Regions:
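N-terminal leader regions that mediate targeting or early regulatory function
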Residues: 1-103, 107-110, 114, 118, ...
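Extended amphipathic alpha-helical bundle segments that form the ordered cores
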Residues: 121-125, 129-143
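Helix-rich DNA/chromatin-recognition modules in eukaryotic regulators
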Residues: 14, 24, 140-146
Length: 147
């Protein structure tokens, strides 16, 4: 059903073109579905310094969690929490196409860990539009035999 709906998605207008008019997911729709506030600070990764750091050598999801989960202590360390948030953002919130944790979400994870009021619904909305556009491009390439 989703693939059928994507046939109505227009990349240039980022809208579904239906018989009764155009339709698009809005920031309020994302906020309602995810229970995230549509307000908050805009995420800015530039110039943000933090003392929290961890190893990004092995990024496959399973290995990443095993390497950043301390089983010796019941308390969650800052590094563990940031690693989990990075994993969570990469796999479940922004649904990266890779089978690895995306390093790009580390700064956002650190800011969330430190309690910064980041407006995630704007980021998710943008990611949704980008994913819909990419899905439509993939469908068209498959249908034309390019892929």
């Amino acid at each position: 059903m989703l693939i059928a709906a994507l046939h109505f998605w227009n990349i240039s207008t980022t809208r579904l073109h239906l018989k009764f008019g155009m339709l698009t997911p809005t920031l309020l729709d994302v906020a309602a579905i995810t229970s995230l506030k549509p307000t908050g600070q805009t995420f800015d990764p530039e110039g943000y310094e933090s003392e929290i750091s961890f190893d990004f050598k092995r990024l496959a999801y399973g290995i990443f969690i095993k390497e950043h989960h301390n089983t010796e202590s019941a308390e969650v360390t800052d590094e563990e929490h940031v690693a989990f948030l990075t994993y969570w953002l990469s796999m479940y919130i922004f649904c990266t196409r890779s089978i690895q944790v995306a390093k790009g979400y580390k700064t956002l994870a650190i800011q969330l860990h430190e309690g910064r009021n980041v407006c995630l619904s704007k980021l998710i909305s943008g990611s949704l539009y980008e994913s819909l556009n990419q899905a439509v491009i993939s469908i068209k390439e498959y249908q034309s035999g390019v892929a």
